[in-house]
Structures are given as structure tokens and as C-alpha cells.
Amino acid sequence: EFLRPLFIMAIAFTLLFFTLHIMAMRNEIWRRRIAAQRRLAARMASREE
């Protein structure tokens, strides 16, 4: 009787952990892409001068 909610919450927290972990990875990928684009834009701007 008491184990059922425990298992449900364990599954819910596991899914929450993986969801937040995947979101953090996506944010890191976007952050690196933006940084790379800024570096490329700075290189292109320095070549034009």
C-alpha cells in the first residue's frame, strides 16, 4: 500500500532529473553555438578593416 506512491515518486523524480539534464545540455549546446558565431563574426569584421 505504501510502496506504490514511493515507486511513482521515484519514477517521477528520475524523469524530472533526466528532463532537466537534457535541457541543461541543450542550453550548453546553444551557448557554444552562439559563442562560435560571435567569434566568427569578430574574425570576419577584423578582416574587413
From Swiss-Prot:
Look up and give the membrane topology term.
Multi-pass membrane protein
Output the Gene Ontology cellular-component terms.
Answer: plasma membrane
Specify the domain of life of the species encoding this protein.
Answer: Bacteria
Alphabetical UniProt keywords: Cell inner membrane, Cell membrane, Cytochrome c-type biogenesis, Membrane, Transmembrane, Transport
One GO-annotated biological process of the protein: cytochrome complex assembly
What does this chain do? Required for the export of heme to the periplasm for the biogenesis of c-type cytochromes.
The name this protein goes by in its record: Heme exporter protein C
Q: Which organism is it from?
A: Rhizobium leguminosarum bv. viciae
- Source taxonomy lineage? Bacteria, Pseudomonadati, Pseudomonadota, Alphaproteobacteria, Hyphomicrobiales
